[in-house]
Amino acid sequence: LLLLLAHFAAAAVAPGLAKFLNRRAFLVLALVPAAAFAWLLAQTGDVTAGRSIVEDIAWVPSLGMDFALRLGTLQWLLGLLVTGVGALALLYCAWYFKPDDPSLWRFTGVFTAFAGAMLGLVLADNLLALYIFWELTTVFSYTLIGHNPVRSANRRSATQALLVTTFGGLAMLIGTV
């Protein structure tokens, strides 16, 4: 849970960090998924031995609703993939973006939050957590794809991604009800 919160906390401070460090902010932000990757690697022994790590937070106890995260073998493997690619992508962004890019400050926060939402999606252990992280990835992918609103192709692609993931989320919601 702390790894997820670290992603969202970093996303909250990322715009200010980008205004201060410019594109070098990506190098600092890459430390968050890299730390998650390192933590996942440290869990290799437990996970390969068949032990799961579970975090269960009561959300609405009277309705039996909780927010559950689990790290089993599949989640561990996908978590390594998500955090590893997330860290590498953030490192690449430090060289990809131009120093004077006006959308840099917005992109840093959204990308870091997206990386956290993807990790949450991988670790989700019940439908409530899965649905929350699915919807977060929907919103963040829309803003990432459309990060340059001046280009009509970006706006069109972002809208298409929003529609596809929203319909997927609606299908998931209908399936759970």
Predicted feature locations:
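...captures the hydrophobic TM-helix bundle architecture rather than a specific catalytic motif
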Residues: 1-177
